[in-house]
Amino acid sequence: MEDHKISMEKIVSLCKRRGFVFQSSEIYGGQNGAWDYGPLGIELKNNVSRAWWKEMTQLHDNIVGLDAAILMHPRTWEASGHVENFTDPLVDCKKCKSRFRADHLPPENLEKRVCPDCGGELTDTRKFNLMFKTHIGPTDDNSSVIYLRPETAQGIYVNYKNIIQSNRMKIPFGIAQIGKAFRNEIVTKNFIFRTCEFEQMEMQFFVKPGTDDEWFDYWKKQRWAFYEKYGVRTNKLQWHQHGKDELAHYAKDAYDIEYEFPMGFKELEGVHNRTNYDLTRHTEYSGKDMQYIDQDNGNEKYIPYIIETSAGLTRNVLMFICDAYDEEKVADKGNDDDWRTVLRFHPNIAPITVAVLPLMKKDGLAELAEEIRNELKEEFKTDYDQSGAIGKRYRRQDEVGTPFCVTVDYDSKEDNTVTLRFRDSMEQVRIPRTELISRIKTEIKNYKRAH
């Protein structure tokens, strides 16, 4: 597609039609800001999380994983500053009852207190805490208040000493976590980009003070390289450094990797130098010593600085779909049937790796195709489709991003060969059935996006 311009409407339509994402509770009219991941969506989401997890805990010897509880002691959120500071400015329209983030309104509307929807009068701005508050146990008084975690990072900080002791970790080292977080957003919008329930992929890297700038630069490079590795077009990515007015209260420096979504450049992932703020606060509030003892350097004691990489998993899913989406003219016959919709996922990200397609259902081709699929599914996520013309079946696989199709025809019965089709180029090669698995693995290893 020229300049790769797409609309969010096309993305949403494709996601629902092909089983990537559905509106939550749709039969009841839908729950605003909540989404369910369908058969292809969950495969895509799992592949993105596996790629990130491999990058962190497998390719780095000094990073380990954690799965902390969603419900944490409420003092955690007092120490982190969330109870006091995790707020957005809120205004209401007295007439139409719409709610707005004050900092997202046009300045003239906010200054004149005029609703942008109906022209009614806006209320004064007030702070709105984004944490979901609930109660634990049989009572619902202040003693039973608990929060759904608004971020996964604090679960890492409170386990930092446990992991040092149990895994004999030495600084510098990191702790990675993928998990759900919850924020009572004033406005949820742009499909799965901003929702109240979402998943984060966060890594907290503990370093000696004075080395933090060096590690900050290292992780900036690492995180940019991750998106390049999985085929994201770098002309759609940019860095945004937080100005002094944007920096969080705990941050020494912060950069966002932004992606050009249909609604413009928006944050995809943040790399933050959180200094020793979090561990210092948890020391104060818990009474526990969070200092690191450097046994290799004369038992020197210090509270580590933390370099954080924080990405939204669900936001990454949207990014990979948007970045992969393409519409391509495949013939010059002057009608709409000559266009195909294709998702150009990296093969390691694609929800289906290979589809097996018998040319016909009869004459034993379907049975042979099932045999081949059974061989392939030991190695790859596979699909099987025997309905309709072969060209339409190719198009269906293109639309969900399947990088390889294997066609089983009458020659396959005679000489034990199959046709391997490539999604991006639509080229086809004839290869022996016995070489199919090794050829697909080689193609995945050497994959380079051409569009």
From Swiss-Prot:
GO terms for cellular component: cytoplasm. Keywords: Aminoacyl-tRNA synthetase, ATP-binding, Cytoplasm, Ligase, Nucleotide-binding, Protein biosynthesis. SUPFAM superfamilies: Class II aaRS ABD-related (SSF52954), Class II aaRS and biotin synthetases (SSF55681). Substrate binds at R101, E151, F198, E199, Q200, M201, E202, E308, T309, S310, A311, G312. CDD domains: GlyRS-like_core (cd00774), GlyRS_anticodon (cd00858). The keyword Electron transport does not apply. One of its GO terms (molecular function) is protein dimerization activity. Its EC number is 6.1.1.14. GO terms for biological process: glycyl-tRNA aminoacylation. HAMAP family: Gly_tRNA_synth_B. NCBIfam families: glyS_dimeric, PRK04173.1. Homodimer. Belongs to the class-II aminoacyl-tRNA synthetase family. This is Glycine--tRNA ligase. It comes from Treponema denticola (strain ATCC 35405 / DSM 14222 / CIP 103919 / JCM 8153 / KCTC 15104).
